[in-house]
């Protein structure tokens, strides 16, 4: 997540918003068996690296055209990658300058699938290699760990996966940024996606669009542009609801849809950050550990600047009415940045993406795991020449996790609702309702440890959105998300320690869900800005719902 619109002070805060977005005996064999029975599609549990055949004759998408894109191995990844492709695809040039978007494509493991799930990171300008390498790809290399390992909760266990560096100016993409709005971003993406499908011979697939953080703007606009094409051969996002409008309910029919994590969907700086900031600190008081004097000043600011009254009036179920527009207040009422700056006093390693974190900063192969860069450090993984060669990436690109230059250039990169050069209206004002109404299968989820995009702020944005003729949710979310899948990622660690072998059981209640009129809401416990990284089992369930494999979370 990037969104560098807040004025902040000091070296540490200069990087603000850079990367951007129970059973009674859970270890018993009976409980494990029951949990396994609940999942018809689940990761395969093994403790040694899984190895797929390197014989390309078994690869579904390998042909003479895709052969140059095949990834045979990656540095420091000491197991067979299976079928995997990456590279650049050209899009329309601008002023005689070539432009291209970079992608990584991992086909589904096991039984073939005609589902294709796109995943986009946010920023604007943050590379989707982040999600590929640390969130939902086939393997993962987490901060502070020695080497990459198989990701037991990888989304490639369920669907073909496509990660894309976009818009132009992001990651390994090539060209000078020209987009001033989401329509232009979507046009470039659809051109890329059409060429990608032609390259791999993909037709008549169900398409799912997902992403996190600022991709809360990308995903609805790209999805809406796909719907505009009215072309189910290449852009089958609309699906066919199995129920009449007045009986809408989740269904495993042919519906497709979209998934948004910790997403910028409303007026982010005010509704999803500034307004809910103080209640967030109250909820997590022991983590922030502010002194009594500072907490008293926050309470005074929250009331005197009108935040309390606004929140009380509009954070209601059902919605009390259309919320009047508000914008970031940089005066003495700037409560969000006051909290952000003060947080570094009790916790010098404060991480707004995951407020549970403390010092030391863990070395991250992607460069920095928080707002603070880790220095000195080795070359970032995706900036290594050998990694670029393996991925068929441009050698002359200086890869950055999040671009330091604008990738959206409206008003010289500072116009639009979020002041980042994106002139399009907020998704809640049109594109997001349109996708919900067309698919009846959209999931919006927020992690409870995320200070960048706060859970109740996202809910407040939903309460200001009209879809299927009604404003917001009629009832407050209250249904628990009970994860019965046993632990798969760390089971080997438990099993290797005497006396710990039965502790890798189901998680139990890991969040709250609510479904109305085609929209599923999920609050995820013990997760920050990157839910798939923090809570792989919960994220896996989210994807199962999106694909229609389960009716609830």
From Swiss-Prot:
Q: Which UniProt keywords apply?
A: Carboxypeptidase, Glycoprotein, Hydrolase, Protease, Signal
EC number of this enzyme? 3.4.16.-
Matches recorded under Pfam families: Peptidase_S10 (PF00450)
Q: Which pathway does the record list?
A: Secondary metabolite biosynthesis
Q: What is the purpose of this protein? A: Serine-type carboxypeptidase; part of the gene cluster that mediates the biosynthesis of aculins. The pathway begins with the synthesis of 6-methylsalicylic acid by the polyketide synthase (PKS) acuA via condensation of acetate and malonate units. The 6-methylsalicylic acid decarboxylase acuB then catalyzes the decarboxylation of 6-methylsalicylic acid to yield m-cresol (also known as 3-methylphenol). These first reactions occur in the cytosol.
The residue ranges flagged as biased composition, category Basic and acidic residues, are 34-49
Which residues, renumbered to this chain, are glycosylated?
Answer: 55, 90, 96, 157, 230, 236, 291, 329, 456, 464
Give yes or no: UniProt keyword Hydrolase: yes
Instruction: Cite the InterPro entries for this sequence.
Output: AB_hydrolase_fold, Peptidase_S10, Ser_caboxypep_ser_AS
Biological-process GO terms, alphabetical: proteolysis
Signal peptide bounds: 1-23
Q: State the active site.
A: 213, 450, 529
Under Gene3D superfamilies, the record lists:
alpha/beta hydrolase
Write out the similarity annotation.
Belongs to the peptidase S10 family.
Question: According to the UniProt record, where is the region Disordered?
Answer: 27-55, 412-432
Does Cell cycle appear among the keywords?
A: no
Origin species: Aspergillus aculeatus (strain ATCC 16872 / CBS 172.66 / WB 5094)
Q: Which GO terms describe its molecular function?
A: serine-type carboxypeptidase activity
User: What is this protein's name?
Assistant: Serine-type carboxypeptidase acuI
């Amino acid at each position: 997540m990037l969104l560098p619109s807040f004025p902040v002070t000091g070296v540490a805060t200069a990087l603000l918003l850079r990367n951007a977005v129970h059973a009674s005996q859970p270890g018993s064999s009976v409980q494990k068996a029951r949990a396994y029975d609940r999942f018809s599609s689940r990761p395969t549990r093994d403790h040694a690296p899984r190895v797929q055949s390197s014989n390309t004759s078994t690869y579904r998408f390998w042909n003479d055209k895709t052969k140059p894109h095949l990834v045979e191995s990656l540095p420091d990844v000491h197991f067979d990658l299976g079928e995997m492709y990456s590279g650049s695809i050209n899009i329309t040039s601008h002023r005689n300058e070539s432009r291209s978007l970079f992608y990584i494509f991992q086909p589904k493991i096991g039984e073939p699938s005609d589902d294709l799930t796109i995943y986009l990171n946010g920023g604007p300008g943050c590379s989707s290699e982040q999600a590929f390498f640390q969130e939902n790809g086939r393997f993962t290399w987490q901060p502070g760990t020695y080497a990459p390992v198989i990701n037991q909760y990888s989304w490639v266990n369920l669907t073909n996966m496509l990660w894309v560096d976009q818009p132009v100016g992001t990651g390994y993409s090539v060209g000078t940024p020209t987009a001033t709005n989401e329509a232009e971003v979507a046009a470039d993406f659809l051109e890329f996606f059409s060429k990608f499908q032609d390259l791999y011979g993909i037709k008549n697939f169900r398409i799912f669009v997902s992403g996190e953080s600022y991709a809360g703007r990308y995903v609805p606009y790209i999805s809406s542009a796909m719907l505009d094409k009215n072309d189910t051969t290449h852009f089958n996002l609309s699906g066919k609801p199995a129920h009449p409008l007045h009986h809408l309910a989740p269904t495993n029919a042919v519906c497709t849809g979209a998934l948004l994590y910790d997403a910028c969907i409303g007026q982010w700086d005010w509704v999803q950050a500034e307004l809910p900031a103080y209640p967030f600190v109250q909820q997590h008081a022991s983590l922030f550990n502010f002194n009594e004097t500072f907490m008293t000043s926050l309470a005074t600011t929250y009331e005197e600047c009108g935040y309390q009254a606004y929140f009380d009036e509009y954070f209601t179920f059902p919605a009390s009415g259309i919320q009047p527009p508000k914008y970031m207040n940089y005066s003495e009422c700037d409560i969000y940045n006051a909290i952000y700056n003060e947080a570094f006093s009790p916790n010098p390693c404060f991480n707004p993406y995951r407020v549970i974190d403390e010092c030391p900063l863990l070395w991250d192969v992607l460069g920095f795991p928080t707002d603070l860069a880790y220095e000195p450090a080795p070359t970032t993984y995706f900036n290594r020449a050998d990694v670029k060669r393996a991925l068929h990436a441009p050698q002359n690109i200086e890869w950055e996790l999040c671009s330091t230059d604008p990738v959206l250039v409206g008003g010289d990169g500072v116009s639009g609702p979020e002041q980042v050069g994106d002139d399009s209206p907020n998704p809640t004002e049109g594109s997001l309702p349109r996708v919900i109404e067309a698919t009846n299968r959209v999931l919006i989820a927020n992690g409870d440890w995320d200070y960048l995009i706060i859970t109740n702020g996202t809910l407040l944005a939903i309460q200001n959105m009209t879809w299927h003729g009604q404003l917001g949710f009629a009832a407050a979310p209250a249904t628990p998300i009970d994860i019965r899948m046993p632990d798969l990622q760390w089971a080997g660690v438990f099993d290797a320690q005497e006396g710990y072998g039965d502790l890798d059981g189901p998680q139990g209640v890991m969040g709250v869900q609510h479904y109305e009129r085609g929209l599923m809401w999920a609050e995820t416990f013990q997760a920050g800005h990157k839910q798939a990284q923090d809570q792989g089992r919960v994220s896996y369930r989210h994807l199962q719902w999106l694909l229609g494999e389960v009716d609830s979370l």
